[in-house]
Amino acid sequence: MEQTEVLKPRTLADLIRILHQLFAGDEVNVEEVQAIMEAYESDPTEWAMYAKFDQYRYTRNLVDQGNGKFNLMILCWGEGHGSSIHDHTNSHCFLKMLQGNLKETLFAWPDKKSNEMVKKSERVLRENQCAYINDSIGLHRVENISHTEPAVSLHLYSPPFDTCHAFDQRTGHKNKVTMTFHSKFGIRTPNATSGSLENN
């Protein structure tokens, strides 16, 4: 039996084209998508136009809408920026590092009682690594723990979603939050609210 070779995207545009092919059907091959995203070697000249930072919090910048099958976006993390603990609304979530490092902390789903949430693991994601999570794996928080270097990550969500739940680590209490885009296709979104952007 032949071993299928991982296509190596030469550019970000190439990666997007391959992702469109991979998501053309109804099934998602998680391992294949993760391998393709990891195989792309980050080149800032290809993604800099999407990398729009905010002084106070991380930003979500839409790159491609994946024919309705997925959203591809670039998240920009200033020094010390981080997300809340959150779920992924029954979607697949792929996170590939383009620049810098991010710390991912994985949590178990809270039980019904008001107890502190249980930390399952933590790891540091480095440039060109690609991680995967879905709701059956657990919840996570992502943080740029550097106080000197920004971080940039490429995220794919399938199917796309615009709300999720953010969790209080001390009690497990959850709130529904709506995510907005800081920019779309390299253009700053007018009136993007900075209040309830919680997702990555």
UniProtKB/Swiss-Prot annotation:
Induction: In hepatoblastoma Hep-G2 cells, down-regulated by phorbol 12-myristate 13-acetate (PMA). Pathway: Organosulfur biosynthesis; taurine biosynthesis; hypotaurine from L-cysteine: step 1/2. The thioether cross-link between Cys-93 and Tyr-157 plays a structural role through stabilizing the Fe(2+) ion, and prevents the production of highly damaging free hydroxyl radicals by holding the oxygen radical via hydroxyl hydrogen. The keyword Membrane does not apply. Binds 1 Fe(2+) cation per subunit. Zn(2+) can be used to a much lesser extent. Ni(2+) can be used to a lesser extent. Highly expressed in liver and placenta. Low expression in heart, brain and pancreas. Also detected in hepatoblastoma Hep-G2 cells. It catalyses: L-cysteine + O2 = 3-sulfino-L-alanine + H(+). The keyword Oxidoreductase applies. Changing C93S: Reduces enzyme activity and iron incorporation by 50%. Zinc incorporation increased by 20%. One of its GO terms (molecular function) is nickel cation binding. Fe cation binds at H86, H88, H140. GO terms for biological process: cysteine metabolic process; inflammatory response; L-cysteine catabolic process; lactation; response to amino acid; response to azide; response to cAMP; response to ethanol. One of its GO terms (cellular component) is cytosol. Monomer. Catalyzes the oxidation of cysteine to cysteine sulfinic acid with addition of molecular dioxygen. PANTHER family: CYSTEINE DIOXYGENASE (PTHR12918), CYSTEINE DIOXYGENASE TYPE 1 (PTHR12918:SF1). This is Cysteine dioxygenase type 1. It comes from Homo sapiens (Human). The gene is CDO1.
